[in-house]
Amino acid sequence: MRPISGRITSNYGYRVNPVTGEYKLHKGIDYAGNYGDPIKASKSGVVEYSGWISGYGNTIILGHWNGVQTLYPHAQTLNVSVGEKVSQGDVIATVGSTGNSTGPHLHFEIRINGQPVDPLQYIPY
């Protein structure tokens, strides 16, 4: 399921980074949002990380199955702790603009065995 209801503002793929000006891989998709909007777990899983990551700001990482992870960076608040089990649709964080960000949004990534993949291949847009 989609983690947030906002429209997609940036797709997965190579682009000019709006903060650094570098041309590089955008490892996820960006959804427009407002400060405090709920961010929901796209799939059931276990919280592997809940804290600050350089560039990503406040971030939740959920582990799912067979090396699949979902990442939820730039959050305003983090509502879950490491080791906590979450169900699909649970509110795990709220939209913010922490880390390298130009405004409130959710950057959403899916990684398989540590490698980013296009989230739109796995969830509806």
Stretches with model-predicted labels:
Residues 2-125:
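Catalytic cores of peptidoglycan-degrading enzymes
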